[in-house]
Amino acid sequence: MVETQMDKLGFLLNHIGKQITTKVLSNAHITQTMKEIILENNSVNVDGGAAKNVSKGKSPPKEKKHWTEFESWEQLSKSKRSFKEYWTERNEIVNTLLLNWDNVRAAIKKFLNDDREWCGRINMINGVPEIVEIIPSPYKAGENIYFGSEAMIPAEIYSRVANKPAMFVFHTHPNLGSCCGGMPSICDISTTLRYLLMGWTAGHLIISSNQVGMLTVDKRIIIDLWANENPRWLMAQKILDIFMMLTSRRSLVNPWTLRDLKKILQDYGIEYIIFPSNDFFIYEDVRLLMISKKWTNFFTLHELLNDLETIETKTSST
């Protein structure tokens, strides 16, 4: 199953990369406003670059008092003022990361004893991270055929949450034994990268009983992506590259530890930061090792394929 999906993915990448047009990129929620704000706020001058937004006669969304009031990242990205405010706040947080997660950990504690994962959004309120939305997975641990005995959040649920503007998106790893420690799975990483590389959110959190971990992307990676003529194509290539590297390394290294994972991610400009500090997770407890299985790899590829097939469909219709 994995090899078949990989063959199809390779074909799609080669096929789609030659056909992505201005209209397709715009339909994929990549707008000129986002490109301008990201590059302008980082003193980068680029000629050409990502596609301009194609108007279809619809009026732009009404301005909001604060960027968190927009209903989607697509709407927010069309407001230059609001998106600039978001990007400024995001950079301040990523550059310092002096955050107190006590309120979040206290609020999430009762959910960690549930028989399923939860996901939601976190915003900064009066300088403190606060949960503004939290919803449960429809699956109890063991109810999904792809994830065996593990708990999981379906892609459609996670996307529904992550597509709304927020400073952070999170999901829980409940107290269900060895499969649900604080270490992010390869699936967690490849899914969240699609949002982080867009510059959407400062980080994606994995909250467990022993830690708050945050996946975040170096600002330079995002700038380089948006300076490219086809940022969505480059994004797909980068996600696939990271996925393949993690999968191959995971098959060679046993036991697989957080230290191994962090080193690989850092080579790609991605950080997995443990709060209150990286020293908080200094041991390598076998109970917290995430064991990759074939169905995990298939699920990740399946989601990426769906994303790429959507682009292919739109390309063929233009």
Swiss-Prot record:
Induction: Expressed in the late phase of the viral replicative cycle. It is found in: Virion. Keywords: Late protein, Virion. It comes from the Viruses. GO terms for cellular component: virion component. Belongs to the asfivirus F317L family. This is Uncharacterized protein F317L.
